[in-house]
Design a protein with these regions (language model features):
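Signature of the catalytic double-stranded beta-helix
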Residues: 70-87
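Charged, glycine-rich intrinsically disordered N-terminal tails and low-complexity linkers that flank
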Residues: 1-72
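Intrinsically disordered, low-complexity boundary segments flanking structured domains
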Residues: 22, 33-35, 76-78, 160-163
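Nucleic-acid nuclease catalytic cores
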Residues: 67, 84-108, 112-174
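Generic structural marker for isolated residues within well-ordered, non-membrane alpha-helices
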Residues: 45, 78, 148
Length: 174
């Protein structure tokens, strides 16, 4: 049993470029699929180039609107979850590092306590039919499964709950 180390005490004080720079210090949860060769967004080589500072500037503008929408809707996704479950998720705005495997770093959307256990909440949004592939029937896309395993390992929590808002009404949260 362990507590994760804190790499950055408050990520809300970082600029986007500073945050990206800290992310080059290790492998984050969203990097796990690229490492394993199953990321729909980047190859292992792309990830390597990001980590050695060859692609940071180029990556900042790539798909920024979709990323910004996803970030802004995290609070809404959590509010829908709160109404459905009568729980109180909470944010811990730190960047963590695994104490035994220091290359593993992560920051998380939210935590929630359910039945005396601590879970991570990972918020996703998808507003195109193409990006809904993998979510059908209660499934989670494989690249997100790897992200979740990475996050659970860094945080040392009991589990992870993925929330995906795929439309513009509360019934579209899966």
């Amino acid at each position: 049993n362990y507590e994760p180390d804190v790499l950055v005490e408050d990520i809300t004080t970082l600029s986007h470029d500073e945050w990206k720079l800290y992310r080059t210090l290790g492998i984050g949860g969203s990097d796990a699929a690229a490492v394993c060769g199953i990321s729909p967004w980047k190859t292992a080589r792309d990830l390597y180039e990001e980590k050695v500072h060859k692609k940071i500037k180029e990556q900042n503008d790539d798909g920024w609107v979709a990323k910004e929408i996803g970030k802004r809707l995290e609070e809404l996704v959590v509010q829908i979850f709160m109404k459905r479950t009568d729980t109180r998720p909470y944010a811990v705005r730190k960047m963590f590092r695994h104490p035994l495997y220091p290359f593993m770093i992560s920051d998380f959307d939210f935590f929630v306590k359910l039945d005396e256990k601590i879970y991570l909440l990972e918020c996703k949004t998808s507003f195109s039919y193409h990006h809904m592939n993998g979510w059908e029937g209660g499934n989670i896309p494989p690249h997100y499964v790897l992200q979740g395993i990475h996050y659970m390992s860094v945080a040392n929590v009991d589990g992870i709950i993925f929330l995906c808002l795929h439309g513009n009404h509360e019934g579209s949260l899966i």
